[in-house]
Regions:
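Segments of small-molecule ligand-sensing domains
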Residues: 338-351, 362-424
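Beta-alpha junction/loop-to-helix N-cap segments that form part of ligand/metal-binding clefts
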Residues: 69-76, 91-166, 175, 234-241, ...
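Extracytoplasmic "Venus flytrap"
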Residues: 58-81, 106-112, 135-136, 203-212, ...
C-alpha cells in the first residue's frame, strides 16, 4: 500500500508542475462565474481516448447567495483533485482502464428549491455517475433525497448535520465530523483551561446545521456541569446583532459559544468587539478558520472556532502507521502547495473538504476496481483509512448509515505573533495544539 501510494503521490506532484500553467488549470469561481475545470452546465473534459472511461461527477455550487464564500472554496478543492487525477492519467483499474472525470455543475444560488431541481437534472438529464453534495447541511438534505431516489452514490462535504444520516439513506456518505461533535470539544477545552468557569451562553443561527450543533452542545455542556445562562437563536441573514448582544450582556456569561456561517459569524464577532463585552472565551462556528476572518483586524483576536482541518494538523503516513490505518493520497504539505499554486490563496477547511470528497471517491473506486455504483457503495461501506484530511470511516448501521465516525475536529484561535501579525494557532486538542488558548478574549 505504501509503495503504491508513493507512486500515486509522485504522479500527482509531477502533474502539478504542468497543470499549474496549463489552460485547464482550475480558477477560483467568482460570483456568477465559471470554473475552468467545470463550466456550469457543460462537461469539463473532451471525449475519452481508447482505453479510457469518462465518469461524470455532478454537483451544485453556491456561486451566488449567502453561502458563496464557503461553497466556492469547496468547489475549488474538488476541481483541484479532479484536475490532478486527470493530469496524472486517471485512476488505473486492473483491467487496464484509465478512469478520468468530467463534471456537470450549476449555481444553486444558495437555495434548497434550486438544489432539488438541479440534482434531479444531474441525475436524469446529465446522467451523472456520482454526486458531490452542495455546501451546507440544509442544501445537502435537499440533494440527498434525489441521490437516494435515483440511486446515485453521493459524497457529502460541507454538510455536518447528523440528521441527514438518520433518514434511512444508503448511498449518502459524510466527509465531515458530524455536527453533534462540532462544539463539544470547546467545552472540553474550557474545562481544561479554566476549570472554575461555569456560565456559558449559546447563541446560534436558526438553520439546520447550527441548530443541531447548538442543541448537542447544550446537552453535552450541561452534562459536564455548566450553567447555560442563555440559549438564543437568530435568523439567517441577520446583520444587526444589537438585540442579541443586549441579551448576552444581561445574561453575563463567562464564555459565548455558537454562531452559524461565515457572513453572520464575522459580523457577530465584529459587533461583539465593538461593544467590548467581557468574555473569557468566544468560540464561533465556520467563520474563524477562514483565512479572510483576519480582515476583522483586532476584532479577530481571541476568537476561536472548530475546524474540520488545518494544515498544521498532524495527519501523516507515520500517524497512520501508528494508528494501524492505511495511508491514502498526498500529504497536507503537497495539498497546500498545489492549492496555493492553483488559486493564489491559503486553503481553508472548506477547500480541503472539497478535495477530500474527491479523494474518498477515488479510494472507493480503486478499492472496488470498478465504477459500478453498487461496487463503489460496498467499498465506501468498508473504507477505513487516514488521508491528509483525517481519519475516514462511515457508520454502516441502518440507523445512521453514512455518518462519519472517524474524523475529529481541531480548534483554532486567532492570536498575534511577536511582530503583531494575526496568526491562527491550534489550541485544542492538547496533543495537536501549537499554542495555549488566549484568555480572556477582551
Amino acid at each position: 500500500m505504501t509503495k503504491r501510494m508513493s507512486v500515486f503521490t509522485a504522479l500527482i506532484i509531477l502533474s502539478l508542475l504542468f497543470s499549474a500553467c496549463a489552460a485547464g488549470a482550475p480558477a477560483a469561481p467568482a460570483g456568477g462565474g465559471e470554473s475552468a475545470a467545470a463550466p456550469a452546465g457543460g462537461e469539463s473534459a473532451a471525449a475519452p481516448a481508447a482505453g479510457e472511461k469518462m465518469v461524470t461527477i455532478g454537483y451544485t455550487s453556491s456561486l451566488t447567495g449567502k453561502l458563496n464564500v464557503e461553497s466556492i472554496r469547496q468547489t475549488n478543492g474538488l476541481n483541484l483533485w479532479m484536475n490532478q487525477v486527470n493530469d496524472a492519467g486517471g485512476i488505473q483499474l486492473a483491467d487496464g482502464t484509465a478512469v478520468k472525470f468530467q463534471s456537470k455543475f450549476y449555481d444553486d444560488e444558495s437555495s434548497g428549491d434550486r438544489v432539488q431541481e438541479l440534482y434531479t437534472k444531474l441525475a436524469t438529464e446529465d446522467n451523472a455517475d456520482f454526486l458531490i453534495s452542495p455546501y451546507s447541511s440544509g442544501l445537502t438534505a435537499s440533494a440527498s433525497v434525489i441521490a437516494e431516489q435515483y440511486q446515485k452514490p453521493m459524497i457529502t462535504t460541507g454538510a455536518a448535520s447528523d440528521s441527514n444520516y438518520t433518514q434511512g439513506y444508503t448511498l449518502v456518505y459524510q466527509a465531515y465530523t458530524p455536527a453533534s461533535k462540532y462544539l463539544t470539544g470547546a467545552a472540553d477545552m474550557i474545562a481544561a483551561g479554566s476549570p472554575d468557569l461555569k456560565k456559558i451562553a449559546i447563541v446560534h443561527e436558526n438553520d439546520k446545521f447550527s441548530t443541531d450543533v447548538a442543541t448537542a452542545l447544550q446537552s453535552y455542556a450541561e452534562g459536564k456541569g455548566y450553567e447555560i445562562v442563555l440559549f438564543e437563536g437568530y435568523d439567517s441573514g441577520t446583520t444587526d446583532f444589537a438585540p442579541i448582544i443586549n441579551k448576552v450582556q444581561q445574561a453575563a456569561p463567562e464564555a459565548l459559544l455558537g454562531g452559524g456561517h461565515f457572513q453572520d459569524g464575522s459580523t457577530f464577532a465584529r459587533q461583539l468587539a465593538e461593544r467590548g463585552l467581557p468574555l473569557q472565551y468566544l468560540v464561533l462556528l465556520v467563520a474563524p478558520p477562514e483565512p479572510s476572518f483576519a480582515e476583522l483586524g483586532d476584532a479577530a483576536v481571541g476568537v476561536a472556532g472548530p475546524s474540520q482541518w488545518e494544515p498544521q494538523a498532524a495527519y501523516t503516513a507515520e500517524a497512520a502507521d501508528a494508528a494501524g490505518l492505511s495511508w491514502y493520497g498526498p500529504s497536507a504539505t503537497d495539498f497546500v502547495a498545489a492549492y496555493e499554486a492553483a488559486y493564489n490563496e491559503e486553503p481553508s477547511y472548506h477547500a480541503a473538504g472539497g478535495y477530500a470528497a474527491g479523494l474518498i471517491l477515488q479510494a472507493a473506486i480503486e478499492q472496488a476496481g470498478s465504477v459500478d455504483a453498487q461496487a463503489v457503495k460496498d467499498a465506501l461501506d468498508s473504507l477505513d483509512q487516514l488521508n491528509f484530511f483525517g481519519h475516514i470511516k462511515f457508520d454502516t448501521t441502518p440507523e445512521a448509515h453514512g455518518l462519519q465516525t472517524g474524523h475529529e475536529m481541531v480548534y483554532v484561535q486567532w492570536q498575534k505573533d511577536d511582530s503583531g501579525n494575526l496568526v491562527k494557532q491550534i489550541v485544542w486538542p492538547a496533543e495537536a495544539k501549537t499554542a495555549d488558548a488566549l484568555t480572556p478574549v477582551r
